[in-house]
């Protein structure tokens, strides 16, 4: 199972299920709601092996969790765009966004910015911002960023080490100035 949102960039309420036919079939059968006769039911053979069934499935447990046609079209479009962009171009775009942020923050005293995952397109590149000043408290900065007028969500994984992570997956070029200014303001405010 793959999230339709996040890296692929589709609707958040979507996903892609693929893999073994028997497992995909089991999931598909739990999303059906049939008022149809057995002889009328013609499921796609690639998805459902009708020969393994005793009758038409009734009201699967996943029925109330169905995905709308808008989400299906959205995730298929997002997947097509994801494939068309390609791993190398996507990796280069992510690195470019991170470089803009790193360069814009490089003049702040007592922080150390490290670029991670830049070597291969199979990695998601990240920035690691280490706060080296005496009043540093990454957790407070992260909370301030999330509760700002325009919330900015950063990776809190290493906050106990006074480090903030920047993941580029959801970054959009036109919002980079907002992200940069928010991080700059949060650090500057804490150092006062």
Role assignments for model-derived ranges:
Residues 2-109, 117-121:
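Active-site C-terminal subdomain of aminotransferase-like
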Residues 95, 102-184:
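Conserved C-terminal alpha-helix-loop-beta "cap" of PLP-dependent enzymes
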């Amino acid at each position: 199972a793959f999230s339709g949102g996040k890296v692929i960039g589709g609707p958040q309420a979507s996903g892609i299920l693929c893999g073994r036919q028997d497992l995909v079939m089991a999931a598909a059968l739990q999303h059906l709601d049939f008022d149809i006769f057995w002889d009328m039911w013609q499921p796609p053979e690639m998805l459902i092996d009708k020969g393994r069934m005793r009758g038409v499935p009734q009201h699967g447990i996943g029925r109330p969790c169905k995905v709308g046609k808008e989400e299906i079209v959205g995730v298929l479009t997002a997947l097509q765009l994801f494939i068309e962009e390609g791993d190398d171009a996507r990796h280069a775009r992510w690195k470019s966004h991170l470089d803009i942020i790193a360069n814009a923050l490089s003049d702040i005293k007592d922080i150390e910015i490290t670029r991670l995952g830049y070597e291969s397109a199979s990695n998601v590149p990240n920035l690691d911002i280490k706060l080296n000043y005496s009043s540093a408290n990454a957790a407070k900065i992260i909370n301030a960023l999330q509760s700002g007028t325009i919330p900015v969500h950063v990776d809190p994984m290493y906050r106990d080490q006074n480090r903030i992570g920047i993941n580029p997956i959801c970054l959009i070029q036109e919002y980079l100035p907002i992200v940069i200014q928010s991080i700059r303001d949060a650090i500057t405010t804490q150092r006062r």
